[in-house]
Amino acid sequence: GQPAFMDIAHLCAPLAKLLAVRWTIGLRTPGHTVAKLLNPFEAHAVQGVRCVQVVNHTHPEYAHSLTDYLQLVQAHALLMRGTEGEPVADARRQPRFDVFLNGQRHAGLSRAPEEGVLVELPNLPDGHGAAVTAAYLNDVMRGSKPLPASIAAQADCLVESLNTLAAP
């Protein structure tokens, strides 16, 4: 299928208003956590569509409440500390990955964080602009630049989790 996008204002106008408060106070609100937990694919689980939702937190304290939530709703999820609020592993260092299947932490699929001093940094672009990022992603997709190990580990963790869900 093709990627789809729906503005949060159309999905839930009150949540959109709460998210907009960030631009007034300069901080994310609990509304950002609620928005991250929205999972449009869960509605298709009855039809056999399986997904492992990537749930990220910015502050370590949120890991506890999100763990409680994922257990309560019996989620299939990968919980991790995100990068700049996004649900992607830091390209410089692998964060801890906690995998939940049916709300239970799966130790065999979860991964410990990379600790200690970084001795080598991945070859990343010099800027953060859209054009620079797009060019870098194209290079990675073509294989002319390597995918950072931490992001490859996140992808592997998700594939292994989906395979575990699909197993009889």
How would you label these PLM feature ranges?
Residues 1-168:
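Glycine-rich anion-binding loops and their surrounding alpha/beta cores
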